[in-house]
Amino acid sequence: MTTITEELIARLKQGITSGVDLQPRQVNVGTVIAVGDGVARLSGLDQVVASEIVEFPPKAGRNESIYGIALNLEQDSVAAIILGDDETIEEGDMVTSTGRVISVPVGQGLLGRVVNPLGQPIDGKGPIVYEKTRPIERIAPGVITRKSVDTPVQTGIIAIDALIPIGRGQRELIIGDRQTGKTAVAIDTILNQKGQGMVCIYVAIGQRRAQVAQVVGTLERFGAMEYTIVVSATASESAALQYIAPYAGCAMGEEIMENGVMLNGQLVKDALIVYDDLSKHAVAYRQVSLLLRRPPGREAYPGDVFYLHSRLLERAARLNEEYGGGSLTALPVIETQANDVSAYIPTNVISITDGQIYLESDLFNAGQRPALNVGISVSRVGGAAQTRAMRAVAGKLKGELAQFRDLAAFAQFASDLDATTKAQIERGQRLQELLKQPQYQPLPVEDQVAVLYAATNNYLDDVPVPLITKWRDDFLAFLRTAHPEVRKLIYDNRLDRKFPTPEVKEALEAAIKEFKATSNYS
């Protein structure tokens, strides 16, 4: 009988202690002394570090833990922003430090998913399978690890690819008033990455839920979600979640840049990230800072609002071969008020980025879509980020459009113009018309080169200005059906230093002449 009792006691001990960590641990525990507006003031957390996650454990009336980020470390208290609903947190509640900074899931499992800034799925497609996480904040790659930008990101938009080329690893700002097509440019760029070996991340900050749902619907309709991750922090989310959203998206992009993901059976190490938009991000950070009682500066923004965006955008890079050769290209979006690009946040982001695509409401209302102001827009990478073929045909285009702008301004004050000036103005109008492009219809590089070659070599001089876009669409349809070999020839020779090669020139000119002979646009 004694043996059975001892055996029973031994089993009970084993059952009690199995799976239980009996080692003593030091836990930094504090209490909530005040809470409100998404900010909790805590006492007793004397070992917490900046940006550390703090945990409000479950209690009566709350089944799950709530987390926050410690941002203000003061002499006798800590102020933390709460990531979630603060209604169940009360004065006197217990809070513990976790010893870790905020991290998000990264890697293959996120492709095709819509997540919140904490990496949690919000698309109703079940849990995300992931093997690792990354901290959302990280120091940008150093000078030694980087490589100069020399490979293009084809946006599929003629005006951008020809005049303001974007390279892999570049940071190109999209700036303009509300309703000028900023998001449309970004979405068209994502759609055009199909089959280009590029993973796209779309970060929606402070937008309406309906608008985010519309973007996701568009990406699904065109088959772009299979290589896209959407990070959504809508206007209904707390300012704290809107503040961390772009950093979370950037961490996901850095994982692709450094380690890559499998896409259509190939390892892809190039990522494109769209921050839509950083104006709302700055407003969310201003709200958080004012609630934390940080001293306000110009336009009530805190003093480190420049650093807010510079530390984010500097993480975009093209790594050299020694470090994997991956890239992270950033397209930040900024919304201006009444075309004022000299306001605080726009000037900050303009000075951080490698160029800007400036969209104007006047051009948009006049029917120029995309409403690109070619005069103010610039890419500091320039022709280095273009294929040889595009550089060859776009060189003339820039000069002729610049001439047209000067002559058009002069023509307003001159009553009668000579024939040469009239011809140049008409030519400029044709080129401007050629740059109009419907939304969700990005063009591959071979189609862009074919059209621009025809335009810059006087083949459109007899086509009336109102019929230019119809001529372009019909000509490209003719090339696709009757002469696919010409498109293939352009694509295969796009990197040739002597583009257009005699073979390409002969085939392309023959196709243009054949099309003109069989069609009438008078």
Curated annotation (Swiss-Prot):
<dbReference type="InterPro" id="IPR036121">
    <property type="entry name" value="ATPase_F1/V1/A1_a/bsu_N_sf"/>
</dbReference>
<keyword id="KW-0139">CF(1)</keyword>
<feature type="binding site">
    <location>
        <begin position="176"/>
        <end position="183"/>
    </location>
    <ligand>
        <name>ATP</name>
    </ligand>
</feature>
<keyword id="KW-0066">ATP synthesis</keyword>
<keyword id="KW-0472">Membrane</keyword>
<comment type="function">
    <text>Produces ATP from ADP in the presence of a proton gradient across the membrane. The alpha chain is a regulatory subunit.</text>
</comment>
<comment type="similarity">
    <text>Belongs to the ATPase alpha/beta chains family.</text>
</comment>
<dbReference type="GO" id="GO:0015986">
    <property type="term" value="P:proton motive force-driven ATP synthesis"/>
</dbReference>
<keyword id="KW-0547">Nucleotide-binding</keyword>
<dbReference type="GO" id="GO:0046933">
    <property type="term" value="F:proton-transporting ATP synthase activity, rotational mechanism"/>
</dbReference>
<dbReference type="GO" id="GO:0005886">
    <property type="term" value="C:plasma membrane"/>
</dbReference>
<keyword id="KW-0406">Ion transport</keyword>
<keyword id="KW-1003">Cell membrane</keyword>
<dbReference type="Pfam" id="PF00006">
    <property type="entry name" value="ATP-synt_ab"/>
</dbReference>
<dbReference type="InterPro" id="IPR004100">
    <property type="entry name" value="ATPase_F1/V1/A1_a/bsu_N"/>
</dbReference>
<dbReference type="GO" id="GO:0045259">
    <property type="term" value="C:proton-transporting ATP synthase complex"/>
</dbReference>
<dbReference type="GO" id="GO:0005524">
    <property type="term" value="F:ATP binding"/>
</dbReference>
<dbReference type="InterPro" id="IPR038376">
    <property type="entry name" value="ATP_synth_asu_C_sf"/>
</dbReference>
<keyword id="KW-0067">ATP-binding</keyword>
<dbReference type="InterPro" id="IPR033732">
    <property type="entry name" value="ATP_synth_F1_a_nt-bd_dom"/>
</dbReference>
<keyword id="KW-0375">Hydrogen ion transport</keyword>
<keyword id="KW-0813">Transport</keyword>
<keyword id="KW-1278">Translocase</keyword>
<dbReference type="Pfam" id="PF02874">
    <property type="entry name" value="ATP-synt_ab_N"/>
</dbReference>
<feature type="site" description="Required for activity">
    <location>
        <position position="377"/>
    </location>
</feature>
<dbReference type="InterPro" id="IPR000793">
    <property type="entry name" value="ATP_synth_asu_C"/>
</dbReference>
<dbReference type="InterPro" id="IPR000194">
    <property type="entry name" value="ATPase_F1/V1/A1_a/bsu_nucl-bd"/>
</dbReference>
<dbReference type="Pfam" id="PF00306">
    <property type="entry name" value="ATP-synt_ab_C"/>
</dbReference>
<protein>
    <recommendedName>
        <fullName>ATP synthase subunit alpha</fullName>
        <ecNumber>7.1.2.2</ecNumber>
    </recommendedName>
</protein>
<dbReference type="InterPro" id="IPR023366">
    <property type="entry name" value="ATP_synth_asu-like_sf"/>
</dbReference>
<dbReference type="InterPro" id="IPR020003">
    <property type="entry name" value="ATPase_a/bsu_AS"/>
</dbReference>
<dbReference type="InterPro" id="IPR005294">
    <property type="entry name" value="ATP_synth_F1_asu"/>
</dbReference>
<comment type="subunit">
    <text>F-type ATPases have 2 components, CF(1) - the catalytic core - and CF(0) - the membrane proton channel. CF(1) has five subunits: alpha(3), beta(3), gamma(1), delta(1), epsilon(1). CF(0) has four main subunits: a(1), b(1), b'(1) and c(9-12).</text>
</comment>
<dbReference type="GO" id="GO:0043531">
    <property type="term" value="F:ADP binding"/>
</dbReference>
<dbReference type="InterPro" id="IPR027417">
    <property type="entry name" value="P-loop_NTPase"/>
</dbReference>
